[in-house]
């Protein structure tokens, strides 16, 4: 299955934990790649893609293709991967190493856009003697416009829906010792209940919580928005106490009428969560779908195709609280 489940297993390496710093430079650790099937010569490569076919995603969804072998002929492969949309907008690729190509427009997708990923890799040489075998189209739909802005200094998360404030929620972000990344992050996974173990993200035995409710992944290195039933109620809206995640008030087992339960039910894969006023640096562009933190010139510079992408010069994403 070459859909989002396989992709996320590769991106996250199975790690579920609050916080996590990625590699030594703050980027996500290099992602292992799925092993290719045994094939006859010449060896082949596949592209594992996200979002999934037929899915409805948020306006911040970035198309990601992970390759089962390292790509050295990047321009040839990139020309075999295009993204079209209705209504049409220019979409440009950006390489994060030899096994990952992300593609996005200059600004977030408009609600209702139908996006199609065209994989025309059959017979394309990705490296010396290594050829692609895929030829397929994958379409998904962009849903309503929801984005949230976490002000780490004010301990609030403002949820916007179609340009209007939907709700302001009190939060607890990363503690002074374990600060939360700034920048635009994208929800990539949702767990109604999951286990979070500090050893999976570099915190050793500092915590092991078997039933974290309403958890939504923001980075490959382990940043989540999730419910928190173990902190006293006064913490939310007044103090930052987490290991880098964004905590919302919840109850054990998760409750639909809690702040965390409400936000979980309102959110879909591809929604953006932007953190501002944290003392930490901006999240790396390859840590999950962090590519919105590159401006358009920086993004297009990561393409292997030298022709003018013909996209308008534009700011990436919105300033805080706007669209």
Give the positions of each predicted feature.
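Short, solvent-exposed loop/turn elements at domain surfaces
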Residues: 73-76, 157-159, 194-198, 225-226
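Acidic, low-complexity Ser/Thr/Gly/Pro-rich repeat segments typical of extracellular/periplasmic
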Residues: 4-7, 11-14, 19-144, 310-317
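Post-signal peptide N-terminal regions of Sec-secreted extracellular proteins
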Residues: 40-45, 139-141, 146, 164, ...
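Exported/periplasmic cell-wall-interacting domains
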Residues: 144-145, 198-323
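Short, charged beta-turn/beta-strand-edge "cap" motif at the junction between a beta-strand
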Residues: 121-124, 163, 193, 278-282
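Compositionally biased low-complexity segments at domain edges in trafficked proteins
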Residues: 146-172
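Short, flexible surface segments
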Residues: 59, 111, 181-182, 269
């Amino acid at each position: 299955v070459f859909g989002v489940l396989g992709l996320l297993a590769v991106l996250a390496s199975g790690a579920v934990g609050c916080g996590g710093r990625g590699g030594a430079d703050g980027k996500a650790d290099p992602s292992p790649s799925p092993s290719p099937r045994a094939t006859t010569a010449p060896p082949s490569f596949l592209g594992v893609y996200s979002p999934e076919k037929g899915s409805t995603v948020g306006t911040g969804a970035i198309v990601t293709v992970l390759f089962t072998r390292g790509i050295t002929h990047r321009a040839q492969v990139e020309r075999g991967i295009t993204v079209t949309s209705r209504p049409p907008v220019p979409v440009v690729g950006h390489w994060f190493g030899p096994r990952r190509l992300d593609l996005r427009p200059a600004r977030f997708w408009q609600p209702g856009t139908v996006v199609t990923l065209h994989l025309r890799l059959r017979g394309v040489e990705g490296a010396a003697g290594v050829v692609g075998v895929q030829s397929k189209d994958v379409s998904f739909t962009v849903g309503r416009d929801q984005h949230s802005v976490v002000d780490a200094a004010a301990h609030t998360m403002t949820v916007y829906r179609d340009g209007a404030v939907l709700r302001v929620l009190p939060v607890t972000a990363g503690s002074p010792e374990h600060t939360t990344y700034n920048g635009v992050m994208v929800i990539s996974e949702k767990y109604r209940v999951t286990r979070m173990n500090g050893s999976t993200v570099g915190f050793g035995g500092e915590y092991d919580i078997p039933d974290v409710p309403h958890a939504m992944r923001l980075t490959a290195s382990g940043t989540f928005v999730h419910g928190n039933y173990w902190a006293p109620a006064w913490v939310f809206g007044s103090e930052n106490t987490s290991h880098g995640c964004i905590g919302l008030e919840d109850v054990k087992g998760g409750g639909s009428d809690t702040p965390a339960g409400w936000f979980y039910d309102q959110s879909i894969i591809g929604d953006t969560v932007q953190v501002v006023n944290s003392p930490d640096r901006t999240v790396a562009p390859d840590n999950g779908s962090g590519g919105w933190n590159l401006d358009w010139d920086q993004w297009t510079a990561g393409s292997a195709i030298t022709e003018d992408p013909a996209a308008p010069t534009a700011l990436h994403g919105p300033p805080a609280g706007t669209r």
